[in-house]
Amino acid sequence: MLFLMDVGIGAGSGLVLSVPALLWLEKERQKKGEKKPWHTAGVCLFAFLLAGIVTVTGIPALYRLRFDANVNLIPMAELFSNFSQYLKNMILFVPFGFFVPLLWKRERMVEKTVSIGFLFSLFIELMQLFSMRATDIDDLLMNTWGTWVGYLLFRGVLRIMPGICERFGAGENPGLDGFFCEGDKPSGKEAAVRAESPVCRLEMELCFGIVLLLMLTLQPLIAEALWELLYR
């Protein structure tokens, strides 16, 4: 119960802090001629997911960083003795692998989605060098595997609900692998608008940056204050 409360407070406060910046991104998108409320709702849910992952993995606030390396570089050494933990690490990143290609059309190649999941997991593991937690290659492998499973889930849902891409997706799909969803191919004025919009090109990176910056600075202070109120 305390674990669920901790995740709820961490992810919820991270989302609340991120909402103003995410709404600003939507406003900038509307200025360029794209109005996508479902996409904005999806980005907010993705921000909640990022904040939840940061909370669960115990990334420390910047003002609490203290180098205390505990590193495991031997892959799958405890696969059978600690299988449930391997499974949890994989499941943690399944929603991540689903939402990235759903929300951003230019990330709809499996290589891009899995690479993003790998880099995010690598960031987490490197930060855990400063959090008195273990930096484990198994976590990196299972998180990346979970991202791939999430991508497969996205492709499966796409077969059942082909219109979901256009409803939640934004930006332009270059179609480098020949994979286009319904409505992915812009033309005429719409293509020109998208090509000129830096928000379309950088929205995912901005979302990551905003959420991670807030989770490493302001959010821990707010979470501490909320816990103090609960236990008064």
Task: Describe each region flagged by the PLM.
Residues 1-126, 130-132, 152-232:
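Bulky hydrophobic segments
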Residues 131-134, 145:
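A ubiquitous, low-specificity "background" feature that marks scattered single residues
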Residues 69, 141-142:
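Residue-level detector of alpha-helical recognition elements and their boundaries
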Residues 135-141:
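Loop-to-transmembrane alpha-helix initiation sites
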